[in-house]
Amino acid sequence: MNANPKFISANAHVDEAAVAPLPNSRKVYVTGSQPDIRVPMREITQADTPTGFGGEKNPPIYVYDTSGPYTDPDAKIDIRAGLPALRQRWIEARGDTESLQGLSSEYGRERAADPATAELRFPGLHRTPRRAQPGKNVSQMHYAKQGIITPEMEYIAIRENQRRAEYLESLKASGPNGAKLAAMMGRQHPGQAFGATAFGPNGLQEITPEFVREEVARGRAIIPANINHPESEPMIIGRNFLVKINANIGNSAVTSSIGEEVDKMTWAIRWGGDTVMDLSTGKHIHETREWIIRNSPVPIGTVPIYQALEKVNGKAEDLTWEIFRDTLIEQAEQGVDYFTIHAGVRLQYVPLTANRMTGIVSRGGSIMAKWCLAHHKESFLYEHFEDICEIMKAYDVSFSLGDGLRPGSIYDANDEAQLGELKTLGELTQIAWKHDVQVMIEGPGHVPMQLIKENMDLQLEWCDEAPFYTLGPLTTDIAPGYDHITSGIGAAMIGWFGTAMLCYVTPKEHLGLPNKDDVKTGIITYKLAAHAADLAKGHPGAQVRDNALSKARFEFRWEDQFNLGLDPDKAREFHDETLPKDSAKVAHFCSMCGPHFCSMKITQDVRDYAAKEGMSDADALKKGMEVKAVEFIKSGAEIYQRQ
């Protein structure tokens, strides 16, 4: 049973491990053009450079922060009350929505009236759902096409810039060498962006609210922001912005409780999950999702067909448009920000999977394929796509058009079924855009490295640059237990080529349901892949953190090395396995090479010698080699000598 009977809403509490601030970090807020636009960032404090290395100040580094109020010591966290509705005033001020009398989905009303769910229900929601007024469209894409810069767009522009300009100014003011230091720390290798317009020599130096608006209006980016999820902090998914990552959570029929899923969500966002998908497939899906949404500062995605299938006791052939429609409305009124909908699985494509090694591996894809075959007709998702668009624009739910025919092995990569579905997704994108509904496209899957760029290029062409959202791809099939690595390789590559969001893979992929440790491992692996892609594309400011960590490493500022990394806890743990004493945190060596063979220590010795003798580093190195050559000859010119 997936909702553990021991979970009682009255006893629910936050996971303490997810609340503590990260080491040497504090939450800061950057205010926009109005007081309630307060954009969170994580400020990482650095130690001064030791006197022997120049004794300069190292100002704080600012990094993108997805953890919401959870890592803010000033915030009062009560998961029974949920997070503050920070976007509520913006939504109401637009004057194009209305509060409903109550839930309008039949299933939602049934759950609310069912005494069996009373102890599981989220107790802290004291507002009714909102919906667009008749004839209105409340999507961020609709506003963007009208030329309107929303507070969400301004928020995103501030967030994407990560206070880079302020950091460089603080370097300039840090001392006599400030200008030189700013030039060094702001230096970045030119990227290869494969046509992404924001990058390159003539690209943007900072993201502006107007640029955000233009990209959303064009369909190259989406802002997943359901009007019934006002707790969410606005973010953007598009190839001209930082590469984002998604974390999957969710219960199953055999494991996990509501409390555990909320804990997984708070844990995932602590380590950098930009969005979270609730893929619950067991009982009490409705209640689990409510708890997650009300406590999530990041967009929440779902696959509505999973819950619809539960409503017909797991029999795909019994699914109907009416049941699915009610499920969409139920979830939209809870606040789901994006729906994965497998509308591209058409009857004509199903036979194309017959010769595959691994057939149809997508759960949603297999459900719809089975329905198509049972009824020998087109999927109701495809036939009712415009009806779905009407629902999406009434709540501002974004499409994540599902790749139900994605390859489940590298053997099946880039086959006719996969690419046929991709073309259909491109056609559906144009229909959604007619309704000003935001769209991203889901992608594979299992793809060897040499075929990855073809996937990206075809998606850009056929889907008119709508954001691509890929699961990996996994580049080989030989490593169960290590698929976070097999997929991380492909994720870094496809992120570089243009994918806007990467869906994480944990070590448990293909093996079991991930626990909290697996979630963290998947998140860190994919943050690494996304950052590598940002560097390769030449995203403005992407290299600042790398430069800061490299400088800390060269100056033996161990604590700063740990704290500037993606996982300070793991870095500190590995260091302390061999050098646990506090004195080792200031030592000019590590356990790899020891005190006499540290390359960075030797380099610093050369620089000290050069300064003492009044010569350049190169001259000092040459002089030192000459001195050592004389010593070698005087000692007998033997490579191995007795001590």
UniProtKB/Swiss-Prot annotation:
GO terms for molecular function: 4 iron, 4 sulfur cluster binding; carbon-carbon lyase activity; zinc ion binding. It catalyses: 5-amino-1-(5-phospho-beta-D-ribosyl)imidazole + S-adenosyl-L-methionine = 4-amino-2-methyl-5-(phosphooxymethyl)pyrimidine + CO + 5'-deoxyadenosine + formate + L-methionine + 3 H(+). GO terms for cellular component: cytosol. It comes from the Bacteria. Zn(2+) binds at residues 446, 510. Substrate binds at residues 248, 277, 306, 342, 362-364, 403-406, 442, 469. InterPro entries: ThiC, ThiC-associated_dom, ThiC/Bza_core_dom, ThiC/BzaA/B. Its EC number is 4.1.99.17. Keywords: 4Fe-4S, Iron, Iron-sulfur, Lyase, Metal-binding, S-adenosyl-L-methionine, Thiamine biosynthesis, Zinc. Binds 1 [4Fe-4S] cluster per subunit. The cluster is coordinated with 3 cysteines and an exchangeable S-adenosyl-L-methionine. Its cofactor is [4Fe-4S] cluster. PANTHER family: PHOSPHOMETHYLPYRIMIDINE SYNTHASE, CHLOROPLASTIC (PTHR30557:SF1), THIAMINE BIOSYNTHESIS PROTEIN THIC (PTHR30557). Belongs to the ThiC family. HAMAP family: ThiC. Homodimer. Catalyzes the synthesis of the hydroxymethylpyrimidine phosphate (HMP-P) moiety of thiamine from aminoimidazole ribotide (AIR) in a radical S-adenosyl-L-methionine (SAM)-dependent reaction. This is Phosphomethylpyrimidine synthase.
